[in-house]
Regions:
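Aromatic-rich carbohydrate-recognition surfaces in CAZymes
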Residues: 30, 499-507, 511-614, 638-646, ...
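Catalytic cores of carbohydrate-active enzymes
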Residues: 298, 525-526, 644-765, 804, ...
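Surface beta-strand/loop "capping" patches
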Residues: 867-898
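Active-site acid/base region of carbohydrate-active enzymes
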Residues: 449-463, 509, 514-515, 519, ...
Length: 942
């Protein structure tokens, strides 16, 4: 299959049968040492003796220790050449890591054969010594919520990190920069990896995922051609003698450094409309003398999923038209026809496609061998340790400034690569692309702008939450700690609900995209890889319901009922076998199509499957993937899913009624009423709602359990769904406050006590250390739901207290806080540890659905801004000591400047709304009209 390394022996000479014996002995030795490879022996004998040779080969195998692994992974495969097509013979030779033949050479001679050594360029001879200079302290900058390492600019649009030589952040503090075409993750050290379209299937450079070393497969070097001294304009890999400044912004990152009289400013960003990444280096010579410098760009090529699986297939060349370095991987699963290119804006350059030449034997990017030579060799081609490296030389007069542009990307073919190079590789094209980035994010993030007495809320809500949701979750589908690339059915549906105010068309697109991943039976792919759609079919019990839920929420907010009539294909694939939890496959598009409305109907009907307590079946997990063994046998039931299904039925009943589908509307209403009754009858534990029942009927989330006595989401959704008995719902949330809110650690646990030593076997959640991630840590997604529930109950004090706990700025605004929290204080983290000695430490960041839900909590639940078709509703839950706050809202091309005047203590209700001086109503509704004017609205609370 190619999953394991292949050693190929081609033999046609019966007299060289000793080669077969030696290779079999070697293969047995490798297996004994744990080195698993496929040994392929091809019988090249086309004479009348080919059967004799075949028998002798098989006889040697059967007489030795390899007999039991013929045609098995890691075993021996014997094939006659005459049975193989020419394409297969070429393929075997191409993918084999080692090729032996029955030539005149012995096996030892073939093993010891060496390629002719390439002549490398001459070593660089310095003409002067580097001047001694004291390290200049970094200039002080105005920053808010500064923790000693980083803080926000006063407008909150950049997070500025300052690092003195040898200093580092407690964990990588990154920026996830993405567009629909390309993305890159850049850390404060300068480490980066880049992908095109799918961060898992088509990585251009290596994803290291090593937060300790923060390794990188991309870097830029500056070299003084007179002294030979070199450094990187980023803190890694070749740290200079003075400090660095890193500025993470919306769609870009900037690195500032000053060394040897040369100040540098490196901008990195991606094009919004093309698969092109930019690294623009601005240099200023303030040394008082003319300077000769070189700049070198380096990229460790992957062109697929993993470097080790693709490096031998990558072929590089110098493009004769542009001088750019091209790379191809004809065996790449998602990139076989693509051309990857690296280019520099200067005409004079040298290149290499050989990583071994660049780094050197036992070398490292901190001290690459290539920077000890005058230039790069120009060597490209096949069979190399592949990379893309470009070096250019420049001269700087006294006080002169220069801008050098490195572009890196992928094209469908060479002609498109030429177009991208011509369009983007010069300073003008790069500048235009950067201005487009600035313009896009300023426009998108400016759709809702709030001014409140809480400056941390302002900073987070006015940019970072939507930026995290759109750049990392929807477009990038990647972060530093996870390079997923796939769409999660439930994941991006939840994310796009947060985009209703800023980019509602993206929410609409996601509804259609997800409906296309639904099978005829109503279930869906749990996740899938674009563009081809390979993914997993599972028994997860909540995925498909998110389609109906998100559709209802989208229509309620936008009034766009036309989306329900969009015609969408189903998928066709085999159904899961009994006892089968999931399978990975590439399902085909069905000939059957239906409206989005019908897709939602099938999803809801598929969810109407109940267990012994007449509650919905858990399957191999509901929202909590880690509880995959609770209902694996098809009998376990989920209480949280019951609340979620109830909410779906209530919402969709109204939608069905508005479409004239009275039959389904009545079915939804009847099922919702019965489900609510069943929950109250069976799921109430005395002080809170249970979480689930195992297949054998054992309750989970009950006071009878030794572990996981209480789980927060069964309580919070009793409120969010409006389905719980009001008195019980309040009692359940009081239990959450008492048992799961850890004020000493400023976190909100998902469940408690964590799974550890009891007989309960809920699934892989128990494999997490107690107090980590879902197993009793703060799982931020669920913690936001708990906060939302308190707000919906009108408990303003509790809701704002928990919001402050959730706000990452509050975890990293002082040195002692960031030392404990460690991760980025400007974006949401998926989880926070709740176990000593790591209590309060952040888990993985960026790639988490917590960002979208946090935005909805901030804007919709707490500040009370909800869009309802062509109206805005103001229904806030704000602290009693607030006098007023403002929301600037853009509706298409029209701005509404809304001031909410709080009437003092217990100002919970809207008493009057005026627009442009005229009273509109007292119900908290603001009519929306796209007249391209600016409207001033005042909302009075009392």
């Amino acid at each position: 299959s190619g999953d394991l390394p292949i050693v190929l022996l081609r033999i046609g000479d019966l007299n060289r049968i000793d080669l077969v014996k030696q290779v079999l002995q070697a293969h047995a030795y490798w297996r004994m040492k744990g080195l698993t490879v496929d040994l392929v022996i091809v019988n090249d004998d086309f004479s009348g003796y080919r059967a004799v040779l075949q028998d002798q080969i098989l006889g040697l195998i059967n007489a030795g220790p390899e007999a039991h692994i013929i045609d098995k992974p890691g075993g021996v495969f014997v094939r006659r050449a005459e049975e193989l097509s020419e394409e297969d013979r070429v393929l075997f030779q191409t993918v084999a890591r080692v090729l032996f033949t029955d030539s005149a050479e012995t096996l030892l001679e073939q093993v010891e054969r060496r390629a002719v050594a390439e002549r490398l360029p001459k070593g660089l001879v310095p003409v002067m010594q580097p001047a001694a200079e004291p390290a200049q302290p970094l200039a002080q900058r105005e920053r808010i919520f500064c923790n000693g390492l980083g803080g926000f600019t006063p407008d909150g649009h950049e997070y500025v990190i300052t690092l003195e030589p040898g200093q580092s952040t407690p964990a990588p503090w990154v920026n996830v920069i993405a567009s629909p075409y390309i993305g890159t993750v850049v850390s404060e050290s300068g480490s980066a990896y880049t992908w095109v379209e799918n961060a898992h299937e088509f990585r251009l450079t290596t994803w290291h995922n090593d937060p300790l070393s923060d390794s990188s497969g991309e870097t830029i070097y500056i070299r003084d051609e007179e002294t030979g001294e070199f450094w990187s304009p980023t803190p890694l890999p070749a740290c200079g003698r003075s400090g660095y400044v890193c500025r993470h912004g919306f769609g870009y990152s900037v690195f500032e450094h000053d060394q040897a009289g040369i100040s540098s400013e490196l901008y990195t960003y991606v094009a919004m409309d093309a698969p092109v990444k930019f690294v623009v280096v601005k240099l200023h010579n303030h040394s008082g003398r003319p300077r000769r410098l070189s700049l070198t760009g380096y990229w460790e090529l992957v062109l697929g999923e993993w470097r080790h699986a693709n490096l031998m297939h990558i072929v590089t060349e110098t493009d004769p038209h542009s001088g750019a370095l091209f790379a191809r991987n004809d065996f790449g699963r998602e990139c076989a026809d693509r051309v990857v290119f690296a280019q520099v804006s200067e005409q004079e350059r040298t290149v290499t496609g050989n990583r071994t030449e660049f780094i050197g034997r036992n070398g490292a990017l901190s001290r690459p061998a290539a920077l000890r030579r005058e230039r790069l060799s120009g060597r490209t081609g096949a069979g190399l340790d592949p990379c893309a490296a470009i070096q250019t030389h420049i001269e700087l007069a006294v006080e002169q400034e220069r801008e050098i542009v490195f572009t890196f990307g992928a094209a469908k073919h060479a002609e498109e690569a030429h177009y991208f190079i011509q369009r983007f590789s010069g300073p003008a094209g790069a500048r235009q692309a950067l201005e487009t980035v600035w313009g896009y994010w300023n426009h998108t993030l400016g759709a809702v702008h709030v001014e409140t007495p809480d400056p941390t809320l302002n900073v987070l809500t006015n940019g970072w939450l939507i930026y995290q949701t759109l750049s990392s979750r929807l477009w990038g589908r990647s972060g530093y700690y996870q390079s997923g690339g796939a769409y999660g059915f439930r994941d991006q549906l939840q994310d796009t609900m947060a985009l209703i105010h800023t980019t509602p068309w993206l929410a609409r697109e996601q509804l259609i995209r997800c409906a296309e991943r639904q099978f005829n039976q109503g279930d869906v792919q749990h996740w899938w890889h674009p563009p081809n759609g390979q993914g997993v079919r599972t028994h997860f019990s909540d995925d498909y319901l998110w389609l109906a839920y998100a559709t209802c929420r989208y229509i309620l907010a936008t009034g766009d009922t036309g989306v329900l009539d969009e015609s969408v294909h189903f998928l066709e694939g085999r159904e899961l076998n009994p006892g089968e939890e999931a399978y990975y496959d590439h399902p085909q598009r069905s000939n059957e199509t239906a409206s989005l409305y019908e897709h939602c109907v099938r999803a809801i009907k598929h969810g109407l499957r109940f267990g012994e307590h007449q509650l919905p079946l858990m399957g191999c997990g509901d929202w909590n993937d880690g509880m995959n063994l609770v209902g694996g046998e098809g009998k376990g039931e989920s209480v949280w899913l019951a609340w979620f299904l109830y909410e779906n039925l209530q919402l969709f009943a109204g939608l069905a009624r508005s479409r004239g589908d009275k039959v389904f509307a009545e079915l939804c209403t009847e099922q919702a009423s019965q489900l609510r009754s069943n929950i109250e009858t069976s799921a109430w534990d005395g002080d809170w709602y249970r979480r689930a029942w195992f297949d054998d009927g054992t309750p989970l989330g009950s006071s009878d359990n030794d572990e996981c006595k209480i789980d927060s989401i069964s309580q919070s959704w009793a409120v969010i769904s409006n389905g719980g008995d009001p008195a019980r719902a309040r009692q359940a949330m009081a239990a959450v406050d008492k048992r799961l809110v850890r004020r000493d650690a400023q976190l909100i646990q998902l469940l408690d006590p964590p799974f550890d030593k009891s007989d309960l076997e809920p699934g892989y959640i128990k494999g997490y250390v107690p107090g980590v991630r879902e197993n009793g840590g703060q799982y931020t997604h669920a913690a936001i739901w708990a906060t939302t529930a308190f707000a919906m109950l009108g408990d303003k004090e509790r809701a704002w207290e928990l919001f402050a706990m959730l706000n990452p700025i509050n975890r990293g605004s002082r040195p002692e806080e960031i030392e404990r929290y460690k991760v980025e204080p400007y974006v949401m983290s998926a989880d926070i540890y709740a176990a000593a000695p790591h209590t309060g430490r952040g888990g993985w960041t960026w790639y988490t659905g917590a960002a979208g839900w946090m935005y909805r909590l901030s804007v919709e639940t707490l500040l009370g801004l909800k869009r309802e078709g062509d109206e805005l509703r103001i229904a806030p839950c704000v602290p009693d000591d607030w006098e007023s706050y403002k929301i600037h809202y853009r509706y298409r091309d029209t701005f509404y400047h809304i001031t909410i005047q709080c009437g003092g203590e217990k100002s919970d209700y809207v008493t009057r709304v005026t627009m442009d001086g005229a009273v509109v109503n007292g119900a908290g509704l603001i009519p929306l009209l796209d007249d391209r004017q600016e409207h001033h609205v005042e909302v009075m609370l009392g």
